[in-house]
Regions:
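Surface-exposed ligand/attachment interfaces on beta-rich extracellular proteins
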Residues: 1-17
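Terminus-proximal functional modules
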Residues: 2-5, 26-27, 84
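Intrinsically disordered, low-complexity segments enriched in small/polar residues
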Residues: 4, 17-18, 29-31, 76, ...
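Short, solvent-exposed coil/turn elements at secondary-structure transition points
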Residues: 9, 23, 66-67
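Acidic, low-complexity, intrinsically disordered interaction modules
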Residues: 21-63
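Intrinsically disordered, low-complexity, charged/polar segments
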Residues: 48-85
Length: 85
């Protein structure tokens, strides 16, 4: 499995994923797409600790097949297509 940029491709709504952010590390969670959410349409609900994360704070993801152990973090903290400015 390899890390995918959230800005290149999003998981399916309700899909189990691993996600990574520079300030939060690697966690398992579930992606939720809610286009009318006033906070963000792209949210990740953590499976390991109560809380949710926006894709701006965790710009990398990979499919959680339920078998793989915690993956190592990506080689770069931010993908090349991460919005800046």
């Amino acid at each position: 499995m390899e890390w995918i940029s959230f800005f290149e491709r999003q998981p399916e709504d309700g899909q189990g994923i691993w996600y990574y952010g520079e300030h939060i590390g690697v966690w398992a969670g579930e992606y939720s797409y809610s286009p009318n959410d006033p906070f963000s349409p792209h949210l990740i609900f953590c499976h390991e600790s109560p809380g949710l994360v926006d894709r701006m704070d965790a710009p990398w993801w990979m499919v959680d097949d339920g078998v793989m152990n915690r993956p190592i973090k990506p080689a770069k903290d931010y993908p090349d297509d991460y919005p800046s400015g």
